[in-house]
Amino acid sequence: MTIISELSVAPEKPIAEPRKSRKNNPEKTRENILQEAIVEFVQQGLSGARVDAIAERIHTSKRMIYYYFGSKEQLYVEVLEKLYGDIRSTENRLHLAELAPVEAIRRLVEFTFDHHDRNVDFVRIVCIENIHNAEYVKRSDAIKAMNNTILDSLGEILRRGCEEGVFRTDLDPLDVHLLISSFCFYRVSNRHTFGEIFQIDLPDESIKQRHRAMICESVLRYLQA
């Protein structure tokens, strides 16, 4: 996949009259389509992805996919929404508000590190969307809304930490989110080039655990400086 090919995306025309679904569970059908669409977009990029290939994987028709999503581009937008939604919804289940500020930050950093490490497809799709200059993220109010939840959560943790005297008073939640995300994301997005250039096996478990501890310590030292 080249940057040039990724930027040259010709919208596919939806079929006007899709046949009705023979599935008894529309939500399950949508979920199956989304899961296979993730695979196709990760492997082929947006420009190279084919709705026919997605349909083949789940033994359905191209018409069925258009029935649920309208177009390849809208399917891609909903893939983005699903992947961002997965990380944000899991964060909400960490119950960070119930933890002391330092422990809440540590838990959030560890979760972010683990999520990126275990969900390479999320990282790859975000890389593809950056090639497109966030053109499709711009189309989704849902992505913006769901990602604001992490800033609200971080802001509350930082506020409590300041009140308890364990964190600095000049912290911006967005800066802290960027600090955490940049390390966790880069380690996965660049693992092949970084690993080859510096001859390091980033997926190695001992190296992974060292880096996991390192980012936790780095973030906490920044907050407590």
Feature-to-residue mapping (PLM):
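Generic hydrophobic, amphipathic alpha-helix propensity
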Residues: 29-38, 54, 79-83, 87, ...
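Short coil/turn segments at alpha/beta junctions that flank glycine-rich nucleotide-binding fingerprints
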Residues: 43-47, 119, 164
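Amphipathic alpha-helical segments used for helix-helix packing
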Residues: 104, 118-141, 191-198
